[in-house]
Amino acid sequence: MAALNNVGMVDSKDYTIVTSILREFFTQKGFLEVHPQSRLSILAACEDPKTIATYNYKNDIWPLPQTGQMWLEYEMLKDPERAPGYFCVSTSYRNEPNPVPGRHEIIFPMFEFEIKGGIEELEVMESQLLEFIGFKLNTYDNGETYYHGDDYKNVAVKYGVKELENEHEAQLEKDYGPVFFLKNFPNYTSPFWNMAQNEEPQESEQMKDTAKKIDVIIHGMETIGSAERSCDKEEMRRQFETISEGEYSQILYDKFTKERVTAELDEFLKFDFFPRSGGGIGLTRLIRGMKMSGLMPSPA
């Protein structure tokens, strides 16, 4: 096959090992698996509109999916008592204009999840997942275990910048080890429009205008991106229209028409919302991180 056709390929044995571990963790908790890849949507597919690729199906233009998380959220919202959570294995298409070799994949597999509860429950669950996979915990003097983490603004101050870049993620490994929880992202980093905002205490400059978002950095790369979802319908609509200075919504309107996009948004906002959280795991990066930590079997 031509080299181009190898884009996004993952070793089958590595893929089987990692997805089996992840499925075991979530099914033990009673989660249900969803197949979002065959579902058509605009909003549920688009995470970064600047990297959208499209296709024509039945005379309509659709985005190649970048995430399945809103479909997991849909399953949770339409029947809240059915399961404690949902997960899926999906393919993310990112038409990166300037991909960094070894860091950016333009097509890659993801494992995504949705749980009940807010950012505190999310952080606990992700810590449990990493421990289940085998990533080493740190230990306090009193015997309690933990993974290193801090708020985005604190880390930015530490490195003397406003926005963290790839080199700062790499530095986190040197400073703190293989796992770091980066939390509470400022709104100027353009968190996704349905992420919950930190509202208390607003008098704290540290938490002002920040989203309840956690990126788990594994061996210097963002490997899990996650957040608490918003329950505020008006705030979600406002964020949708204003993130990236309005560029996010305008790109979607230009590509798929304002009528279609607004119809999907209106339909989503009809749900009765409750505290919930979710995230996506880049499988190629998780495989990389597991190999670097000696958590993958040696090649046969």
Regions found by a protein language model. Name each.
Residues M1-T51:
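TRNA-binding/sensing appendages of the translation machinery
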Residues V34-Q37, Y140, A300:
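Residue-level detector of family-conserved "landmark" positions at structurally sensitive sites
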Residues K50-G117, G149-A300:
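A translation/RNA-centric and nucleic-acid-associated enzymatic feature enriched
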Residues I119-V124:
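Short, conserved charged micro-motifs
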Residues M125-G134:
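Short amphipathic C-terminal alpha-helix that caps PH/PH-like domains
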Residues G134-Y147:
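Flexible helix-coil linker/hinge segments at domain or subdomain boundaries
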